[in-house]
Amino acid sequence: MVEATAQETDRPRFSFSIAAREGKARTGTIEMKRGVIRTPAFMPVGTAATVKALKPETVRATGADIILGNTYHLMLRPGAERIAKLGGLHSFMGWDRPILTDSGGYQVMSLSSLTKQSEEGVTFKSHLDGSRHMLSPERSIEIQHLLGSDIVMAFDECTPYPATPSRAASSMERSMRWAKRSRDAFDSRKEQAENAALFGIQQGSVFENLRQQSADALAEIGFDGYAVGGLAVGEGQDEMFRVLDFSVPMLPDDKPHYLMGVGKPDDIVGAVERGIDMFDCVLPTRSGRNGQAFTWDGPINIRNARFSEDLTPLDSECHCAVCQKWSRAYIHHLIRAGEILGAMLMTEHNIAFYQQLMQKIRDSISEGRFSQFAQDFRARYFARNS
């Protein structure tokens, strides 16, 4: 796959347009130099410069317009400077469409040991070899530039959950100072400022007043898009939806809204109802490798013995290449035997299912029937467990 350099097209650096609305739900497009992203969008996670078990062309064939890369993992292995030397992340991995990179802040806190936070940034030991590293707003933006990211995320502090109001406030305030430093670092690089987009991240834990302060600070700095951070960290769906109900309306309406690290199909439907436009999550890839397939009738565990002679596809309504060719019985056998092909087929199906879900969401918003779609989706998805 030949890399499409950001300079080769007539498309804008970044342009978001909303084509239709229903309630708080919106559908539209993000135009960038490397391609158009249909929203609401689900971004498969390509942690280490690969969506695990899938070739880039397979990821694209599922309907994905954009993927996510992880700054933390790539800075440690193979290294951001090495990727830049080898032509950038798009060329390196053979994906010619947009890539969003996270800032590394979440992984630093969740994966590395002996982290030490200061106003400057975070020092930490690599989970791979124990080597010491420093990640600051400036270094995070530099790494994302070296990778050649299309959508760059501001560096933030991931507030632990649960947090007291005072702890959440001090964490949010530091994240806002880091957001300004991220903006300045991004703008200081002409190539990055002219070809990529920068998103800010709203923090404030579950507290409405802190979320409002954070949204106001981010809007004053100015970003191309706005993420809702600090959710999907163990608070549960009800609490997440409660926070989204008041948090999303605080963000600029004319910019994309990105819910980081979410989620299950029903999380996505509920978040779209609350005005979210972009999602990413490891769930379809990770759970696929472990034998969980997503279907319109809810998830199934393909390892279960009841599928050992089931000749039907993973989902009878799925249009993916896997469901056109292979049976539950065959994939059951592959997963039980630990065969690599099992992980490949399960992952491809799950990513395709998520993309078909997003297409149905977009179509139903466009046609003014999203609330009915959401109701029907939930009734069927949870019917087995009711």
UniProtKB/Swiss-Prot annotation:
Pathway terms, separated by semicolons:
tRNA modification; tRNA-queuosine biosynthesis
The annotation note on the cofactor reads: Binds 1 zinc ion per subunit.
Cellular component aspect of the GO annotation: cytosol
HAMAP family named in the record: Q_tRNA_Tgt
Question: PANTHER family recorded for this chain?
Answer: QUEUINE TRNA-RIBOSYLTRANSFERASE
Q: What family does the Swiss-Prot or TrEMBL record give for this protein? A: Belongs to the queuine tRNA-ribosyltransferase family.
Instruction: Name the chain's protein.
Output: Queuine tRNA-ribosyltransferase
What are the top taxonomic ranks of the organism? Answer: Bacteria, Pseudomonadati, Pseudomonadota, Alphaproteobacteria, Sphingomonadales
